[in-house]
From Swiss-Prot:
Gene name of this polypeptide: uppS
Gene Ontology cellular-component terms listed: cytosol
Protein family according to the UniProt entry: Belongs to the UPP synthase family.
Organism of derivation: Vibrio cholerae serotype O1 (strain ATCC 39315 / El Tor Inaba N16961)
Name this polypeptide is given: Ditrans,polycis-undecaprenyl-diphosphate synthase ((2E,6E)-farnesyl-diphosphate specific)
Classification via InterPro entries: UPP_synth-like, UPP_synth-like_CS, UPP_synth-like_sf
Catalytic activity: 8 isopentenyl diphosphate + (2E,6E)-farnesyl diphosphate = di-trans,octa-cis-undecaprenyl diphosphate + 8 diphosphate
Amino acid sequence: MQNLSLSQDVLPKHIAVIMDGNGRWAKAQGKPRVFGHKNGVAAVRKTISTSARLGIKAVTLFAFSSENWRRPEEEVGVLMELFMTVLSTEIKKLHKNNLRLRVIGDKSRFSERLQTKIAQAEQLTASNTGMVVNIAANYGGQWDILQATQALAEKVTQGELQPSDIDEDVFKQHLTMADLPDVDLLIRTSGECRISNFMLWQLAYAEMYFTPVFWPEFDENCLIEAVTWFVNRERRFGCTGEQVKALMEN
């Protein structure tokens, strides 16, 4: 792994990753798409371990979108079984390393067996105090905003909340990652330059890093290159460059 000596103040606190390119990578090898998904697991391990060593507070991995159900039934079935297998084989290592696992998204569509496995994995690591690893599965940014809106509407209906009480902070508290900082750095592999309905609210001020590397080939050095690119960015949050520099000097 490359050396990266940086202050925690300049590192991203929350990294989100759209893990793209498994199918195209497999095709280039003359293999079926599922071969790419299985080989992508190694990149997940590397990303989690490297992020933890860097001191990142949270990593969110886009594993399965709400739109991915449209894929061939066989591929979806393999992805669900792969999810089960990875939960079974990786959770003890995450727990040993004091990492906390959470699965975000609409889990009701998963099989009871998978829902049980998810609940067990989350419960095992719930008290861990290290990096939070979010797996976004059957997740969509529009769904996240919709479920938050429905929850707020229910509170208004029940008289627990007035419409005038709802501001950005209140709304955020009803999103699936309310207790985490918004995303600082979004990484998407495979050369595609879009966010694909991922964390629409939380990406408001994220720096977006697009790499041509297919996900199965994304390693420690690739992640460090992305983080290095991030720390050299000037994040403005709506201010001018001069205003940002003045704030940094104070």
